């Protein structure tokens, strides 16, 4: 059964935002895109690269036009747009939202790194990123955030279109999370941020939370008994690491 579609009017503020997003072709800057400047891209010093990223992030003036940093299509952003369009179409029945949702899903499927990794998975970033801890991310480094959001996007689209390919791709990505990112043989089981990090020294808690959200969404679509204990372990990790004041 397809998702129920109603015909409620869209608030004017959402229509304005939708038009702005479409007119800008979903392109945007990112707060960590400083190294995407052709003027700065070849800098090798780790500390200087981090300084550039942070200066670009916190500068009160948008320096990107002067640094010739171009806007890009962000995978995670497109996954979130897909989820928003699915919700808007289900609420309003407006075919424009359905069209944009399908275009966004097409982009997601095209950006899959399955040929490289063996599973459908995605890199969040469209630009090189260097962390203070010397960690790096690239267009060819699949990560848990982009992959989890893509899974949720594909599931939300599948609920409307019943396109079996979307369900198959989501299922493949679930296998990537479980087989490549889940660390179970430790005192506190967790999901790694990237598969390339063979021996993570720290647990990135939002990585486990994102994976739990994606797997739970898939479980609602098609329950798998083998995923249940993984969800429970990830949930226990989040509960175990919560501070007394409720924060993480």
Predicted regions and their residues:
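Glycan-recognition and catalytic cores of secretory/periplasmic carbohydrate-active enzymes
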Residues: 1-248
